[in-house]
């Protein structure tokens, strides 16, 4: 579909890039009580902060709830966009060459195609695994960095604690470097995201499919 997404020919309206979901942003909000570290605005629910989670498992539980909250908001936004497409921008010429639209008497934007898929892209899987691994090892297991210290360092972008940044860079395991439990953290949350998304049906009556983007999305979403 124009770039890297796969689709079938002549029978599918595959909105393959319906949304991009920034996993690390959800983790940032988990650590900071729902407050955006860039703007200072509260944009997510407050399930606690890094200073209040007594265990790594408690942090993961809060992160899981943040995912639920923002996935639901994302789906609502996708539905509004799809409704606008159907109402304001129907595509009769495209519908004429897509299987089942003529038979159903429905435009592709209204769900007339044989298949009606929407793709949601997970962004920052590797960065999420790195972040989770650093939290687990250095904050909770080995206690080399206190929760309060790391939270303050994050809130000030490490300007006042370069040593904390150095410890994170050099002492935390990294995704994709044959550290099995770190790679498993990435796989765990990618699977969790996919399962959460599978609960929803898109506006055209089809399924949401989960993808992963790298390169073009990691840099702007990490800024």
Regions found by a protein language model. Give the residues of each.
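Conserved catalytic cores of very large enzyme subunits
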Residues: 1-126, 130-223
């Amino acid at each position: 579909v124009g770039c890297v997404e796969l689709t079938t020919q002549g029978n599918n309206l595959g909105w393959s890039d319906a949304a991009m979901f920034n996993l690390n942003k959800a983790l940032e909000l988990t650590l900071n009580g729902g407050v955006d570290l860039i703007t200072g605005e509260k944009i997510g629910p407050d399930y606690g902060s890094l200073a209040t989670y007594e265990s790594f498992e408690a942090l993961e539980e809060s992160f899981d709830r943040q995912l639920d909250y923002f996935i639901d908001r994302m789906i609502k936004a996708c539905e509004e966009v799809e409704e606008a497409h159907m109402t304001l921008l129907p595509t009769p010429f495209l519908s004429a060459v897509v299987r089942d639209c003529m038979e159903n008497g429905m435009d592709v934007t209204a769900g007339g195609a044989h298949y009606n898929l929407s793709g949601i892209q997970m962004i920052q899987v590797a960065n999420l695994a790195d972040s989770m691994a650093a939290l687990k090892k250095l904050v909770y297991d080995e206690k080399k960095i206190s929760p309060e210290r790391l939270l303050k360092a994050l809130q000030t972008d490490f300007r006042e604690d370069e040593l904390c940044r150095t410890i994170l860079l050099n002492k935390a395991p990294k995704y994709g470097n044959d550290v099995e439990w770190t790679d498993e953290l990435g796989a765990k949350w990618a699977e969790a995201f996919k399962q959460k998304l599978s609960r929803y049906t898109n506006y055209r009556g089809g399924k949401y499919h989960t993808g992963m983007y790298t390169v073009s999305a990691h840099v702007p979403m990490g800024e």
